[in-house]
Structure formats: structure tokens, C-alpha cells
């Protein structure tokens, strides 16, 4: 038996976050449900697809406001999406849930009444246990940044599963996050304080994307704990657990060429918008290819679509070292890389027409984007 009354709006927000861990395609039918556990002083919501698990604790009061009133402790598993849709459409400000011994759950709000068939919570798989020792603490703002600057470059193809994740390497009080789909590479470096243990793990890109949606900007810090095959992110009232990917992440340091032939400094916004315009035709051509040529403090971008026509853009460079060069690249990769550099000025280093080139914020080595060119010349 379980019975509690809860503020509907607050409940919806927490349920929506819990749903992010639930997949309709699961081998265990019970995992399409949300586990609700009413304890003496809190209600705990759990969602999982066995890769990602989200556990949210709802306290009795938040900022001095009463949120939930628990009359009887107990637990039940309710069909996830149905249940959340019902709660969203209920008329009242409060919702009351009560269950019987068969886990039939009565949901009432205003003049509405729903009866749902619940499942036995004892059948719900136990969440992975992650020890709470040795936390790494980051600010939410920094972690959101790290995800935005690397996660877009993970591979979407399952042929090399390790590349669908971001490699987190912790050594000598530095965190190095690397993502690559073998056509481009994103690296973000970050100084940490007093980290005793070195780590080398691969966190699934999908998990980081979901975590990013849940972290609210008003939370300040997030604690990160690692187990042998799991990682736990603890932020506010949310525990977010993800399975780590197995396997060895390739050594990407050797991809970075040594001495550049040409280095230029350019306005990020102008460069981005010029590529964006040129890509209108590149996309029509079906291959997203844009040609770039450098010379005399000007960068020229061009693209051709046989059916539609041609485009030419010129962007002034602030600083050019070296001679002239022609190179072709995928416009989407370039725009993603520029978006990940939150600096007004970008440095681009070219090493030759068929060698990878590098983008980074001017005067800052903490973010590096590497892109492989396309052979057209």
C-alpha cells in the first residue's frame, strides 16, 4: 500500500527528467515503467533502460514550500509514458496516488480519476552500485561546456562502438575529453584540483546528451563518481548513472601534425556565417563540400551545385602566416567545430592540402578541433 499527494507541476518536471532514461525498445518490459518509491520523508522516482538510469529524489519541501504529503509508504512501477501523459493532463494543482496490494493505482486530481495497473516493484532491476568515494567536482556550467565542445563529434555508427563515446582521461590533475568519428576530432582539456586517482574511461555520447538536458543552470556543482563499468553524476536531487563503454579508445595524439604551413586568425562569427551561406549550395550538391583558399589576408570560400549554380564568399583574416593553400572540407564539420569554440577569434592551422587542419580559440589551448579534409584538388 502506498499513498501520497503531490504538487502536480513539480511532479511533471521530475517525471519528465526520469522519462529521459526510459526507452520504448527494451528487452525487459518492466523497464518501460517508472518506479515510484514513497518513503517516510521523500518520494524516489527511477527510470532506466539498463544503459542509463536516472533516480530523482523528491523531498517533502522545496524552498519552504510543501511539495509532497506522504500518508503511507510503499512502491509501485507504473507504465512510464502513459502515466506521465495522464499527470500532465490532470485538472487540479495536486495529484493523489494510492495503491492496493495488487499494485492497482488510483490517481485522482480535481474531478478526474484514473485507475492504472501497476507492476510489482520487486521485479524492477536493482540499480548499479557506484561507490561514493573519490568524487570529481565540476561546476554545472563547465560540464555543460565540456559536453557542448566534444559530444557532437562522437560517431553515430556502431561499427566501432568505442567511438560512440567520449574518452575521459584523468591524469596529473588534468581531465582530457576526446571525441572522434574518424573524420573529425574534438578535444577539451581542463585542470582539476587534488584528484588522487588516474582514470581512463569512455562515456557513451547518448548518456552525456541526456545528462546535458537534465542539468539545470541554477544548480552549481556536480559530483562525478566512477566504478569499474559505471559512472554516476550527482547533481541536486538527481542521480544519473551510465554504463561505460568497454574497449580501448584509440590514441589520437599522433593525429596532430607538428609544424603548420599556414596559420590564420579569423573572426569566428563572420567565418561561421560565410560557411553557412556557402553550405546552402554544398548541401544541394549532396556532399557538403566547400573549397577554401588562402592568400593576402583573405580567405575565399566557394561551392558548386551542378543543377543550381555557384557561390563565392570572402572573409578577411586578421593575421596570416605562411603562403597560400587550397583545401576542401565538409561544411557541417567546420560549422560544428566553430560552434564549439566560444571565442570571438579563431586560429586555424593548415599543414597541407591533404593533411588534417586544426581550429582553436585564439591564445587558448584548452579546446582543439581537428578536421580531415576532402580530396577535391
From Swiss-Prot:
Gene Ontology CC, one term: cytoplasm
Domain of life: Bacteria
GO molecular function, one term: 3'-5' exonuclease activity
One Pfam family named in its UniProt record: DNA_pol3_beta_3
Location of this chain's protein in the cell: Cytoplasm
InterPro entries associated with the record: DNA_clamp_sf (IPR046938), DNA_polIII_beta (IPR001001), DNA_polIII_beta_C (IPR022635), DNA_polIII_beta_cen (IPR022637), DNA_polIII_beta_N (IPR022634)
Name recorded for this polypeptide: Beta sliding clamp
Organism annotation: Staphylococcus aureus
Gene assigned in the entry: dnaN
